[in-house]
């Protein structure tokens, strides 16, 4: 297993997990796209960022009396890129962090990015999202398939996702 991750305090003791550290969206894109041809399943747990500075600074930007305008550009969409290049024998799982029109946006991403499953993380749900140890997700699959899950620990949510991937492989996916 290759775990491509930005800066983290995770301690990985398992000998079969290879941590690939990255610090920028461009490094993440490079790490994912160069390894993707050799994987059976890719789980894209989060977008790096939707936007990145046009001119990144390597030092602190000092406060200016006249104000400051930060110019941003869209980052490369890594999930869309691997969805575009995936083979029929590969599975790609994406995630959608949404606040409005959540189900519609998640299903649109599933199709436009050519994903096999997408995990909807709706930030408007109580107990879901960031700053909590719980989550409530809906997993969508192609052909209008869906699986709704109750609020539970994020560890159990991860197990649900793995189970849905297993069902997809076996041809009995609920999502």
Language-model-detected regions and their locations in the chain:
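A cross-family phosphate/adenosyl-ligand binding-site feature
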Residues: 1-97, 101-175
């Amino acid at each position: 297993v290759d775990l491509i991750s930005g800066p983290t305090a995770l301690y990985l003791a398992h000998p079969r997990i290879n941590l690939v550290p990255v610090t920028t969206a461009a490094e993440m894109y490079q790490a994912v796209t160069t390894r993707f041809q050799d994987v059976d399943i890719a789980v894209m747990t989060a977008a790096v960022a939707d936007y990145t500075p046009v001119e990144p600074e390597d030092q602190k930007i000092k406060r200016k009396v006249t104000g400051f305008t930060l110019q941003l550009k869209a980052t490369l969409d890594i999930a869309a890129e691997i969805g575009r290049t995936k083979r029929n024998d590969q599975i790609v799982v994406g995630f959608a962090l949404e606040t409005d029109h959540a189900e519609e946006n998640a299903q649109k991403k599933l199709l436009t990015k050519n994903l096999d499953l997408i995990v909807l993380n709706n930030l408007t749900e109580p107990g879901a999202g960031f700053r909590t140890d719980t989550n409530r997700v809906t997993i969508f699959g192609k052909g209008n398939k869906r699986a709704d899950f109750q609020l539970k620990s994020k560890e159990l949510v991860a197990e649900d996702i793995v189970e849905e991937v297993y069902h997809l492989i076996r041809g009995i996916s609920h999502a």
